């Protein structure tokens, strides 16, 4: 007898499905907007909302450090990129501090021409404008390049000069 399956399989095995969901969640929090098929977006939406709720729990000031660490580790099971985790806990969670649910929205687009799939966009409801996101990325890159240059300069100054010794041939 067939029983009802609560998991949307997305025509993939468990490992592939989990990797797909994790990567899409990471992209959603990194770029605050992703485009994919409706079926994938519906699955990713539920997981993303749960992670935002988990990140919001860390905003409570009288929360035990063990619970805060537990929340971060639970989120890091899904999101492997540390920068995205920091963005989720420090930026995205603060934007949704007063909201109870409804952190994302799915917008329907025209069906894809090649296979007539239902396509849509999943985005955060209080999304930053594209121009501010670009400015933040440029500033971040500049900081990283300065740090790299300083690191290279310290390496060069710390390394001792190599003297060339001439070798004479034995006759």
Curated annotation (Swiss-Prot):
Residues 140-152 have a biased composition (Basic and acidic residues). Residues 140-171 are annotated as: Disordered. Keywords: Ribonucleoprotein, Ribosomal protein. Pfam families: Ribosomal_L17 (PF01196). Residues 156-165 have a biased composition (Polar residues). SUPFAM superfamilies: Prokaryotic ribosomal protein L17. One of its GO terms (cellular component) is cytosolic large ribosomal subunit. One of its GO terms (molecular function) is structural constituent of ribosome. GO terms for biological process: translation. Belongs to the bacterial ribosomal protein bL17 family. Part of the 50S ribosomal subunit. Contacts protein L32. This is Large ribosomal subunit protein bL17. It comes from Leptospira interrogans serogroup Icterohaemorrhagiae serovar copenhageni (strain Fiocruz L1-130). The lineage of its organism: Bacteria, Pseudomonadati, Spirochaetota, Spirochaetia, Leptospirales.
């Amino acid at each position: 007898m067939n029983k009802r399956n609560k998991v949307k399989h997305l025509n993939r095995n468990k490992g592939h499905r989990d990797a797909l969901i994790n990567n899409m969640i990471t992209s959603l929090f990194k770029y605050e907007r992703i485009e994919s098929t409706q079926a994938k977006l519906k699955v990713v939406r539920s997981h993303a909302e749960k992670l935002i709720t988990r990140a919001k729990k860390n905003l409570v000031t009288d929360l035990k450090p063990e619970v805060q660490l537990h929340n971060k580790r639970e989120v890091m099971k899904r999101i492997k990129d540390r920068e995205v985790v920091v963005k989720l806990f420090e930026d995205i969670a603060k934007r949704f501090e007063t909201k109870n649910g409804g952190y994302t929205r799915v917008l329907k687009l025209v069906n894809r021409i090649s296979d007539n799939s239902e396509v849509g966009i999943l985005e955060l409801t209080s999304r930053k404008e594209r121009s501010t996101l670009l400015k933040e990325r440029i500033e971040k890159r500049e900081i990283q390049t300065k740090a790299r240059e300083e690191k290279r300069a310290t390496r060069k100054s710390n390394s001792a000069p190599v003297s060339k010794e001439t070798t004479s041939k034995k006759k």
